[in-house]
Amino acid sequence: MKLFISADIEGCAGVALAYETHKNEAAYGEFAKQMTKEVVAACEAAHEAGADEIVVKDGHGDATNIDPLCMPDYVTLIRGKSGHPYNMMSGLDDSFDGVMYIGYHAPAGNPGFAISHTSTGNSLYIRLNGSCMSEFMLNSYTAASHKVPVLFLSGDSTICGLAREMVPDITTAVTKTGLGASTYCKAPGQVEESIRQGVKKALAGNLSRCSVELPETFTYEAVSYTHL
């Protein structure tokens, strides 16, 4: 079984403020370590469930957040930005059996998480076919274009709910819950265990149950905070 994991940092355990995800801030290092731990938890669980080849795409910022020295032997880690239009999904193709997401977050325009955004912090909101477009939505349509099922997501409670609306049979693991500008965070160990259990559950049974159907047309609307 060959799996693709796209990882972000804002939805990982403990992250509550944007500056905690910036490399030039003292707080960043510990959260990058936690991002690495959650990715490793997903990889180990997937391997135990039968995955013999796993590709992980570091999808945050300059894409050099995950510690490559912590990756298991059966994992290929994609670091840095190639300029490929798939961005957080760069490396995905038709050969994969499933896609998983670690550390994902609510989209721009959704008040469910203090640092909700889509791609950058410049957009007030982005709508696709009338719905606020999350990175999960965009990346899942990328997976759908290759007919690769979307199996698992970890992140804040808002993006977990939105993921289930789009893919009813997806397995999710909630890492935190937002309330206004505050964030109710689960303990890192609890999050890692819920990822392990969730990944194993996601890989049980027929993976095609989590296939995403591409719309016939796309209507895209973006509103930024400032004039371009």
Where are these regions (language model features)?
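Flexible, glycine/charged-enriched surface loops at secondary-structure junctions
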Residues: 49-56, 205-217
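Extreme N-terminal starter segment of soluble prokaryotic enzymes
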Residues: 1-3
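Short glycine-enriched loops at secondary-structure junctions
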Residues: 6-12, 59-60, 102-108, 157-158
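Active-site rim beta-loop-alpha module in soluble metabolic enzymes
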Residues: 145-149, 154-196
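Conserved small/polar residues in nucleotide/adenosyl-binding loops
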Residues: 226-227
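Short catalytic helix/loop segments, enriched in acidic residues and glycine
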Residues: 21-41
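Glycine-rich nucleotide/cofactor/substrate-binding loop typically near the N-terminus or early
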Residues: 39-94
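Active-site glycine-rich loop that binds ribose-phosphate moieties when present
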Residues: 120-146, 155-158
